[in-house]
Structure formats: structure tokens, C-alpha cells
């Protein structure tokens, strides 16, 4: 498993991809609307400005392929658009929460390098003691296994002697 910083970087990359996909979906699937309340504002005038020649040609090609949409189909399309936006928003929220959890798991700014080294040293000592305990348990298991084998041999020998 990757360390927390690598996980955090991966999650941030995924979040950027989700933002990009969401903005792209909105740009390609939504109906144009005013950017603010004032229709004479600079942003609305710029948004309603005519497209450059090459984009106009592409738009006319796309426009000629479009068919008239019935009101029920348009309502379904709007519902589908809203559902997709809700799903994309939920994905972004979940990824943001995952990033927050990863950030919370990182050592704080107030944690000095010395205290981090002390924590690592303590964990290393704890690991060594657990490994020693594991070795002892393995030796105990081997001892019990040999004892069980000797009991089985004694029982088998006793049974064979009683049959002769």
C-alpha cells in the first residue's frame, strides 16, 4: 500500500479529473444562460457574442443534424441532466471527504521531527517485542506438535502390542 502522501496526491489528481469531467459535461450538455442578472453586463455580452468562423461552421453542421425535441423528451433530458449533475457532485464531495481524511491522518504542523522520530523509535521497539513473542509462540507450537506426535506414536504402539 502506498504511503499517505502518495495516496493524497492520487486523490488530488482524481479530484482534478472529476472537476474537469464535470465542467466538460456542463459545457456540452447544458443550455446557455445569462451569467448574472444584468443582461447588459460585460460577461453576458461576451457570452452572447458571435462565434469565430470555424466554430460557426461546426455549429451549423451540428445544428443541421439536430431534430426538433418534443416537450416530454426535453423534460426527460433535463431530468437526466439533473441526475447526472447530482451524481457528479456526489462523487466530488466523496473524493473531497477522502482527501480531508488523508490530510487529517498526516502529522500536524506542531509535531516536531524529534517527536516523530521518537514515535518511530517506539513503534520499532514495539515491533521487535511482538516479533520476539511470535518466535516464542512458534517454538511453543513446535514443542506441542512434537509432544502430540510422541503421544500418537505411544497410542499406536500400545494398540499394536495389545493385538499381538
Curated annotation (Swiss-Prot):
UniProt entry keywords in alphabetical sequence: Activator, Coiled coil, Nucleus, Transcription, Transcription regulation
Family under the similarity heading: Belongs to the Mediator complex subunit 21 family.
Location(s), subcellular: Nucleus
Gene name of this polypeptide: SRB7
Subunit structure comment from the entry: Component of the Mediator complex.
Name used for this protein in its record: Mediator of RNA polymerase II transcription subunit 21
InterPro entries: Med7/Med21-like (IPR037212), Mediator_Med21 (IPR021384)
Function: Component of the Mediator complex, a coactivator involved in the regulated transcription of nearly all RNA polymerase II-dependent genes. Mediator functions as a bridge to convey information from gene-specific regulatory proteins to the basal RNA polymerase II transcription machinery. Mediator is recruited to promoters by direct interactions with regulatory proteins and serves as a scaffold for the assembly of a functional preinitiation complex with RNA polymerase II and the general transcription factors.
GO annotation, cellular component aspect: core mediator complex; mediator complex
Skewed-composition ranges (Polar residues): 53-81
GO MF, one example: transcription corepressor activity
GO biological processes: negative regulation of transcription by RNA polymerase II; positive regulation of transcription elongation by RNA polymerase II; positive regulation of transcription initiation by RNA polymerase II; RNA polymerase II preinitiation complex assembly
Chain residue ranges for the region called Disordered: 49-81
Organism: Scheffersomyces stipitis (strain ATCC 58785 / CBS 6054 / NBRC 10063 / NRRL Y-11545) (Yeast)
Coiled-coil zones: 114-146
